[in-house]
Design a protein with these regions (language model features):
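Short, basic-rich loop-to-helix N-cap that marks the start of a DNA-contacting helix
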Residues: 39-52
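Recognition helix of helix-turn-helix/homeodomain-like DNA-binding domains
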Residues: 27-42
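Helix-turn-helix DNA-binding elements, focusing on the entry/boundary residues of the two helices
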Residues: 18, 29, 44-47
């Protein structure tokens, strides 16, 4: 399972909305959607922002 798939599964499993996570992470909705669909690379800075928004460690997804 790829990192973005783990992030997406975590969001879904915890009943969160992707748009809410994107807003909290400071990532544009379209960019976040592209990352979660594997159409854009999930860079370390984006992963860090997402993890801060989710209040989890990046190691959870690696």
């Amino acid at each position: 399972m790829r990192v973005y798939e783990k992030v997406r599964a975590y969001i879904d499993d915890n009943g969160l909305k992707q748009v809410a996570v994107a807003q909290k992470a400071g990532i544009p909705k379209a960019t976040f959607n592209a990352i979660m669909n594997g159409k854009r690379t999930l860079y370390a800075d984006d992963l860090r922002a997402i993890c801060l928004a989710l209040n989890v460690s990046p190691e959870l997804f690696i």
